[in-house]
Curated annotation (Swiss-Prot):
Any GO molecular function: isomerase activity
EC number assigned by the record: 5.5.1.-
Gene name of the encoded protein: cghA
Record-stated family: Belongs to the Diels-Alderase family.
Pfam families, per database record: DA_C (PF22903), DA_N (PF24137)
Pathway assigned in UniProt: Secondary metabolite biosynthesis
Function: Diels-Alderase; part of the gene cluster that mediates the biosynthesis of the tetramic acid Sch210972, a potential anti-HIV fungal natural product that contains a decalin core. The PKS module of cghG together with the enoylreductase cghC catalyze the formation of the polyketide unit which is then conjugated to 4-hydroxyl-4-methyl glutamate (HMG) by the condensation domain of the cghG NRPS module.
Keyword Ribosomal protein: no
Keywords associated with the record: Isomerase
Lineage start: Eukaryota, Fungi, Dikarya, Ascomycota, Pezizomycotina
Descriptive protein name: Diels-Alderase cghA
Length: 503
């Protein structure tokens, strides 16, 4: 982000709306005012006033350049009617705007017509509220709860990268999580190296802002920033994590500036695999819960520096870099998810996969519901061969389903307990997964891949310790398999996120 942040008191400004609809500035005075609830949000010029009428859409306020422009910023402000508007003539409405907060932005973000800023103690709705609808043929990157976050909702923007040989892997998920308020905004980061080093931290911050430059909320360049309040450039406690996605979904850039923790960037250049949903159903991972891949596969470039705690000296840290690019055949992608309720409330098991083996790319998000929903398997998955989709699996088959009949593309997921692979730390003690993709096409083709745990990545408990303790685990996995009934045998690498929850 550019611009020099500065602290300033709230601003009070008046403007008059005459019967002909023209806005006439009355001038502005800088004064300290008590905090007021706000219901207007927009990009304005500090030192000027907005033409936006009260109750207009929060992220579509027009801008007006009245007076000296002192700082381009994103502002919170409240508009209220001013009594005695007589000096402006009969029929004139006079409104007062009180700027309560400003957040410096890049020029591009300040000019964006669609802005979602959540921060402070006013961002959470009092009761659960619905998110906005799926937009067909869109990455749906603008927040679904743009103005107020539902207290039960979670929105996620996920970016990852991996070396072609599995020697290094990285993932970050940007969360807006109403269930974790007031710590709702975090970037969950995990990294792994072939020497066994792992790094897992959450950057928890008080501010989350996402902008889109249009022409509507479903299309356009999107930028997101998770950050501390107005950090100074020399402030070693500052934390900023940001993402930037091109309007055509061709590129992404993720940047970290958290001194003493993580700095650097991840970039993607999409390979153009077909991914975008054309309907609600194509975006769903379960009824009413959405998870899909705006970028299913991309060339990735990583240049990150991590600060790792010394277990023998809490005051000492060592630096470790991760550098991946074309030389390492680095690949990755981007996932987008939003759920009206934390999926852990409804699910007992989850599996995330992104992997590459020979000409195949596979991407999976699969949930298993809790007993009151009969352990139903639901999924949003895709198998690509040479960049073309061969199984768009929106149907999840139970592990014991072994027949070949298929009326729709589907995937069967089965936990592996025998053979090579690291044993998972928590309840199920599996050594990997078998993915069996099916096509409903004329040939009724079937592909089977074994994903075996090669390196443990992250491991976080989701229950109390014990023999049946559950957890959230990540693995670098070795992939083998191919087309069933043929001599094809491919090899590759991938990553899995495996979550177990109590019933």
């Amino acid at each position: 982000m550019s611009g020099t942040p500065r602290t300033m008191p709230p601003l009070m400004m008046d403007w008059a709306e005459q019967p002909n609809g023209r806005a006439k500035p009355r001038g502005m005075v800088i004064s300290r005012v008590p905090y007021l609830p706000w219901y207007l949000l927009g990009a304005v010029r500090v030192g000027g006033v907005s033409n936006a009428r009260p109750n207009s859409r929060p992220y579509s306020a027009e801008q007006a350049d009245f007076g000296r422009i002192s700082q381009t910023a994103l502002c919170r402000y409240r508009s209220m009617p001013v009594r005695n508007p007589t000096p402006y003539g009969v029929g004139t409405q006079v409104w007062r705007a009180v700027v309560l907060h400003h957040l410096p932005l890049t020029a591009a973000m300040a000019a964006a017509p669609f802005i979602s800023l959540l921060q402070g103690d006013q961002f959470l709705a009092d009761t659960p509220i619905p998110g906005s609808a799926v937009i067909p043929n869109s990455g749906n990157l603008f927040p679904k709860w743009a103005d107020k976050l539902s207290p039960t909702a979670v929105e996620t923007w996920l970016f990852d990268a991996m070396a072609e040989d599995g020697s290094a892997a990285f993932t970050v998920s940007f969360f807006r999580d109403g269930s974790q308020a007031p710590a709702s905004f975090r970037a969950a980061i995990n990294a792994a190296w072939s020497d066994g080093t792992v790094w897992s931290q959450h950057l928890v911050v008080p501010v989350s802002v996402v902008t889109s430059d249009g022409p509507d909320v479903g299309h356009g360049h999107v930028a997101g920033v998770w950050r501390t309040e107005e950090p100074q450039s020399n402030d070693t406690t500052r934390t900023t994590a940001s993402f930037d996605v091109a309007a055509d979904l061709s590129t992404t850039t993720v940047v970290f500036d958290a001194p003493g923790r993580i700095t650097g960037s991840l970039t993607h250049r999409s390979l153009g695999y077909p991914t975008l949903p054309q309907s609600d159903r194509e975006a769903e991972v379960a009824p009413g819960a959405y998870w899909f891949r705006p970028i299913a596969m991309a060339n990735a470039t990583v240049d990150l520096t991590f600060h790792i705690d010394d277990p023998t000296n809490p005051d000492k840290k060592t630096e470790k870099r991760m550098v991946l690019g074309p030389e390492q055949g680095a690949f990755g992608g981007m996932d987008r998810s939003w759920l009206p309720m934390v999926w852990g409330k409804e699910a007992t098991d989850a599996l995330f996969v992104r992997a590459q083996a020979g000409p195949y790319v596979m991407a999976v998000m699969r949930l298993v519901s809790k007993p009151h929903k009969y352990y139903q398997n639901t999924v949003n998955a895709a198998l690509y061969r040479d960049g073309k989709i061969v199984s768009n699996a929106l149907r999840s088959l139970p592990p014991d389903r072994r027949d070949t009949a298929a009326t729709a593309d589907a995937v069967r997921t089965e936990k592996l307990y025998d053979g090579d692979g690291l044993v998972a730390k928590y309840r199920d003690k599996n050594v990997g997964y078998r993915l069996e993709f099916r096509s409903a096409g004329p040939e009724r083709e079937k592909w089977s891949f074994d994903l075996r745990h090669h390196q443990a990545w992250w491991a976080k408990p989701t229950s109390r310790p014990g023999p049946d303790g559950t957890g959230n685990s990540g693995f670098v996995v070795e992939v083998t398999g191919g087309l069933v009934g043929s001599e094809e045998s491919v090899h590759g690498w991938g990553m899995t996120g495996e979550v177990e929850l109590s019933d």
